[in-house]
């Protein structure tokens, strides 16, 4: 079983190489016309499987299409990776949409709304105290 340092090092190498493949080797208009970033790679302890989380500036429906296209192209990506890096076995890949940024923004929006509500309530209380 590989140690965490080795898994992190291999994940970093996979991220770098897959990014290069996405930028230079894939001939897909949907993928080329949208900014795609690999945010995280989760590699299994036995190095056989990896989940590749992507972020994009595109809308949710387009991001789903991007993930579908990437999953259709994963055989090509895996084959190209095998030619570029020395690994006993290139891991099976699954591409997923990383929604962490979206969730973080919605939490920030909720916090801002709560802050505004509290500010409005405090203003009403001050206004009522002045009338007394």
Curated annotation (Swiss-Prot):
Coiled-coil stretches: none
GO molecular function terms noted in the UniProt entry: ribosomal small subunit binding
Keyword field: Cytoplasm, Ribosome biogenesis
Protein localization: Cytoplasm
Pfam family, one: RBFA
Assembly, per entry: Monomer. Binds 30S ribosomal subunits, but not 50S ribosomal subunits or 70S ribosomes.
Record function comment: One of several proteins that assist in the late maturation steps of the functional core of the 30S ribosomal subunit. Associates with free 30S ribosomal subunits (but not with 30S subunits that are part of 70S ribosomes or polysomes). Required for efficient processing of 16S rRNA. May interact with the 5'-terminal helix region of 16S rRNA.
Protein's name according to its UniProt entry: Ribosome-binding factor A
Lineage: Bacteria, Bacillati, Cyanobacteriota, Cyanophyceae, Synechococcales
Gene expressing this chain: rbfA
């Amino acid at each position: 079983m590989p140690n965490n340092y080795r898994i992190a090092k291999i994940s970093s190498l996979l991220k770098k190489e897959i990014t290069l493949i996405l930028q230079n080797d894939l001939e897909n208009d949907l993928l080329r016309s949208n900014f795609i970033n690999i945010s995280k790679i989760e590699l299994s302890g036995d190095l056989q499987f990896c989940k590749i989380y992507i972020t994009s500036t595109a809308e949710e429906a387009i991001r789903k299409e991007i993930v579908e296209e990437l999953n259709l192209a994963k055989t090509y990506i895996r084959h190209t990776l095998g030619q570029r890096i020395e690994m006993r076995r290139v891991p099976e890949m699954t591409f997923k949409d990383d929604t962490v940024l979206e969730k973080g923004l919605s939490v920030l929006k909720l916090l801002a709304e709560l802050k505004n509500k509290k500010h409005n309530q405090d203003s009403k209380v001050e206004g009522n105290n002045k009338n007394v």
